[in-house]
C-alpha cells in the first residue's frame, strides 16, 4: 500500500488533506513523492441544516427535571462505531447510571450489528437503525458522546453535533485531527471513569453545558461551514494552477488528489 500511494502521489501536481494530522502523516511517509506542501481543506458541514433549536422555541418543562439523554450517531456496521458503543455501554454507562440512574442512550445509525441491537435489551438504550433525519434525535439529547477507541476516517459526526449546539464528550481518538480545545469546544476523556464523570458534569451543570454548546457552534460556523471550506479549496486550486502555469507544459490542466 505504501508503494502504491507513493507512486500515485508522484502523478499529481497537488495534494489536499482534510486535517493537519493527515498532512503531517503524508509529509512524513512520502517526503520524496509530493511536489509541494500539502494543502489542508477541512471537512465541512452545512450549519444551516445542522442548527440548534432556538431557545425561545425549546419546550418548557414544569415541575420536573428532563431525563438525561445521551446520543451517538454513525453507521453501526463500521467496526470503530460498533466497538465504541459496546465499550460505552459495558464500561462507561454503568458509571454514569451510578450517578444518574435515569440516563438514556440513543444509538442512531444504519445497519446496527447483532451485538449493537442486543444492547437495547438492557433497558434505557434505544437502537434506531437507519433514520431519514438524525436532527430530531440530536436535538433531544443532553450530551453527544464519541467514545471511539479505533481511529480512521474523518470525524464529521462531531462537527455535525457541534453545529447543532450539542455538548460533546469524546475520547482523544474520537477528536483526533480536529482543531478543538478540550474544555472549550468539547470535553475529552480517555478512561471509563473520567469519561463518565465528564458526562455527569454536563448533565447536571446546565450553565457549563451551555458554554460548551455556544463555543462549539461558533467554531464550526466560523471555520467549517461550507462557505469557509469553499474558500480554502479556492485558495488551493489557485495555488496549484499558478504553479502549473510556470512549468514547461502550461496547457495541461493541474491535477489534484484528495487524501481522506
Predicted regions and their residues:
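Acidic anion/phosphate-binding donor-loop and adjacent secondary structure
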Residues: 27, 45-59, 117
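Carbohydrate-associated surface elements
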Residues: 21, 41-44
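Conserved acidic donor-binding segment of nucleotide-sugar-dependent glycosyltransferases
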Residues: 186-193, 201-206
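Acidic donor-binding loop of glycosyltransferase active sites
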Residues: 13, 124, 139-153, 164-167
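A short, well-ordered alpha-helix in the C-terminal region of glycosyltransferases
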Residues: 208-222, 229-232
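Short hydrophobic beta-strand element within catalytic cores of glycosyltransferases
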Residues: 157-160, 167-171
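Conserved donor-binding/catalytic core segment of Leloir-type glycosyltransferases
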Residues: 62-89, 93
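Nucleotide-activated donor-binding/catalytic signature segment of Leloir-type glycosyltransferases, i.e.
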Residues: 100-136
Amino acid at each position: 500500500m505504501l508503494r502504491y500511494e507513493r507512486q500515485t502521489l508522484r502523478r499529481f501536481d497537488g495534494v489536499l488533506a482534510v486535517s493537519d494530522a493527515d498532512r503531517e502523516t503524508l509529509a512524513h511517509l512520502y517526503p520524496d513523492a509530493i511536489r509541494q506542501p500539502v494543502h489542508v481543506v477541512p471537512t465541512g458541514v452545512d450549519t444551516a441544516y445542522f442548527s440548534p433549536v432556538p431557545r425561545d422555541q425549546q419546550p418548557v418543562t414544569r415541575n420536573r427535571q428532563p431525563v438525561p439523554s445521551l446520543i451517538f450517531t454513525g453507521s453501526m456496521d463500521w467496526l470503530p462505531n460498533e466497538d465504541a458503543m459496546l465499550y460505552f455501554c459495558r464500561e462507561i454507562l454503568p458509571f454514569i447510571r451510578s450517578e444518574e440512574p435515569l440516563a438514556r442512550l440513543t444509538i442512531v445509525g444504519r445497519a446496527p450489528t447483532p451485538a449493537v441491537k442486543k444492547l437495547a435489551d438492557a433497558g434505557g438504550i434505544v437502537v434506531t437503525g437507519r433514520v431519514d433525519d438524525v436532527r430530531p434525535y440530536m436535538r433531544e439529547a443532553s450530551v453527544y458522546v464519541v467514545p471511539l477507541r479505533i481511529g480512521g476516517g474523518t470525524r464529521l459526526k462531531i462537527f455535525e453535533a457541534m453545529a447543532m449546539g450539542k455538548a460533546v464528550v469524546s475520547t482523544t481518538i474520537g477528536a483526533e485531527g480536529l482543531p478543538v480545545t478540550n474544555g472549550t469546544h468539547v470535553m475529552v476523556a480517555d478512561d471509563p471513569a473520567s469519561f463518565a464523570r465528564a458526562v455527569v458534569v454536563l448533565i447536571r451543570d446546565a450553565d457549563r453545558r451551555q458554554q460548551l454548546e455556544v463555543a462549539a457552534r461558533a467554531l464550526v460556523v466560523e471555520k467549517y461551514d461550507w462557505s469557509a471550506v469553499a474558500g480554502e479549496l479556492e485558495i488551493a486550486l489557485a495555488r496549484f494552477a499558478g504553479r502549473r502555469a510556470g512549468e514547461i507544459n502550461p496547457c495541461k490542466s493541474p491535477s489534484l488528489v484528495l487524501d481522506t
